[in-house]
């Protein structure tokens, strides 16, 4: 299987798109193969999980039982790559910059489209993404280190266990953003209002308390500098299904590559507020 280079030597987006269809067209045409943080800042981005239809019901129950890491935005019809509730022209086979392919729980490759892999029994799930609430944090004047450093956000497996459903079980994955204490308080207030994109943090402070042994070594994404006067702030993350897939070992599962999201036509400001 051909691998796509999604290594950590990523730069900050050197372009943004005011029109989401233009952004998806750039991704579809292969002109954008990098992380999507800040790419279309006013619009909702989504994590992706694709499973055979015989596992779809169990995964739906898993998401419903774990709304912090897996807030459902949309579920496709079996065999249909369109997601009209998220965007009229979306084709889930081509509109994500990089996809991961898991077989029996093992990551076997990354591809830049799913045209050769798509099957009539595939069901696509799109989950809310923290890149969506980053727009609100930046507008509130809260600096985000990974954005300033031109990196993907840091993500970690934790010892926080998800609620199992059918074969799906495993640890929660979290994303981390270092902040000064006052900014962390404001970030809690801002993100608590948007549960569809993970809501409030699940932990602030000592990473060891949630099973992270070395915060300088993220499991996904890129490490960032944490200043002495900053606290690590952890949000539930939509990469959780990838850790769950590794534990559940379904015969086949396809996801986005961490940080390489689906850009939707939903405006961040239109997300339901808690």
UniProtKB/Swiss-Prot annotation:
Residues annotated as coiled-coil are none
Question: Which domain of life does the UniProt lineage start with?
Answer: Bacteria
**GO molecular-function terms, A-Z:** lyase activity
Q: Pfam families from the entry?
A: D-Glu_cyclase
Mind telling me which InterPro entries this protein's record contains?
A: D-Glu_cyclase, Putative_hydro-lyase, UPF0317
Keyword Aminoacyl-tRNA synthetase recorded:
no
Q: Which UniProt keywords apply?
A: Lyase
* Enzyme Commission code(s) on record: 4.2.1.-
Family to which this protein belongs: Belongs to the D-glutamate cyclase family.
What is the protein's given name?
Answer: Putative hydro-lyase Veis_4744
